[in-house]
Amino acid sequence: YEHLFWFFGHPEVYILILPGFGMISHIVAYYAGKKEPFGCMGMIWAMMAIGLLGFIVWAHHMFTVGMDVDTRAYFTSATMVIAIPTGVKVFSWLATLHGGSLKWETXXXXALGFIFLFTVGGLTGIVLANSSLDIMLHDTYYVVAHFHYVLS
């Protein structure tokens, strides 16, 4: 039953973040004085990739339930692949800021804080994507920190 729970419940995590990504893109572009974010089409493709990949990585929440090594290897690899489109988004946000005249207002500071915390959460997520490390870090504050950093 755990597979059913995560198979249907996990993709929503990656789908629910998409509007937040859109808001950050608009906020960063506005407060950098740009008309649109850097790499607009790349950002759109990255969001579609993140949404689709969310459907094939559910079992990274289940590394400790006795999956065989081949299954763990697949979910480790598939989970790490999510870092690629996510990195495209973070790079594009930072590239949007580059060369602009950043206005240090509340919404710009919140967007920069989100980008920083989301990046730290992504780095901890890459560590947790490794099934061997995930098993060792299971039920620790490292996992709690990852979850909260990604949620920013």
Swiss-Prot record:
UniProt-recorded Gene Ontology molecular function terms: cytochrome-c oxidase activity; heme binding; metal ion binding
Q: Which residues bind heme a3?
A: 146
Q: Which UniProt keywords apply?
A: Copper, Electron transport, Heme, Iron, Magnesium, Membrane, Metal-binding, Mitochondrion, Mitochondrion inner membrane, Respiratory chain, Sodium, Translocase, Transmembrane, Transmembrane helix, Transport
Cofactor binding note: Binds 2 heme A groups non-covalently per subunit.
Q: Which cofactor does it need?
A: heme; Cu cation
Q: Which family does it belong to?
A: Belongs to the heme-copper respiratory oxidase family.
> What is the name of this protein?
Cytochrome c oxidase subunit 1
Q: Which gene is the coding source of this polypeptide chain?
A: mt-co1
